[in-house]
Amino acid sequence: MPTPPEAEKQQTGPEEADQPPSMSSHDAAPPAPPRRNPCCLCWCCCCSCSWNEERRRAWRASRESRLQPLPSCEVCATPTPTPTPTPEEVRSWAQSFDKLMHSPAGRSVFREFLRTEYSEENMLFWLACEELKAEANQHVVDEKARLIYEDYVSILSPKEVSLDSRVREGINKKMQEPSAHTFDDAQLQIYTLMHRDSYPRFLSSPAYRALLLQGASQSSSEA
């Protein structure tokens, strides 16, 4: 018959056997690998996207401390005096974007407005394309097409305009044999961008409202 101490040992033995063995410092589980930061992946994806028009304006605004005087020429080639618009002409600019763009004075005022929004390159590109389409000499066409590409299409240019990938691919193919219409699709896209994005703000701008008031005052004085 077991003595009381032996009986106590027999009762406690099974309970100790059911308990899991303790881990020593050598048997400790390896630390969990660090979690990847999901923001890194998102950041990479964002960087692969092209800047939209708002980001371009903000980027240029942060790098330009002041505006330089606007040259009197339209494409900075041959200086010409800026025409003075009539009151009727100024009012017609609000009727349609086409009327604004077909007016030399309208283009000049609108270009000045685009400069304040840091998107003047859109107008410069459109004007350069208009000059290219009027050129008949193939050697001149080749040179002008190259300059337009370097100034407004190349991703290395500070004056790069916002074009989608389809239009860019088309330009790259056409640049193998440039013609006067190499940039037609791109010109239409930039024209549409100015029409939808910048034109409504121009009509509400202080500059255009001042021209309207000036024209109204002029009409009243003549009456």
UniProtKB/Swiss-Prot annotation:
- Its transmembrane ranges are none
Record's compositionally biased regions (Low complexity): 20-29
Intrachain S-S bonds:
none
PROSITE patterns, per database record: RGS
Question: Residue ranges of the RGS domain?
Answer: 96-212
Q: What InterPro entries does the annotation carry?
A: RGS, RGS_sf, RGS_subdom1/3, RGS_subdomain_2
The record's region (Interaction with GIPC) falls at 213-223
Q: How is it modified after translation?
A: Fatty acylated. Heavily palmitoylated in the cysteine string motif. Phosphorylated, mainly on serine residues.
The modified positions for Phosphoserine read 24, 103, 157
Q: Which GO terms describe its cellular component?
A: membrane
Which SMART domains does the record associate with it? RGS
Positions of the UniProt region annotated as Disordered: 1-30
Q: Would you kindly state one Gene Ontology biological process term found in this protein's UniProt entry?
A: autophagy
Domain of life of the native organism? Eukaryota
Kindly give the PANTHER family that the UniProt entry links to this protein: REGULATOR OF G PROTEIN SIGNALING, REGULATOR OF G-PROTEIN SIGNALING 19
Q: How does it assemble?
A: Interacts with GIPC PDZ domain. Interacts with GNAO1.
Q: What name has this protein been given in UniProt?
A: Regulator of G-protein signaling 19
In the record, what lineage is assigned to the organism producing the protein? Answer: Eukaryota, Metazoa, Chordata, Craniata, Vertebrata
Q: Which gene encodes it?
A: RGS19
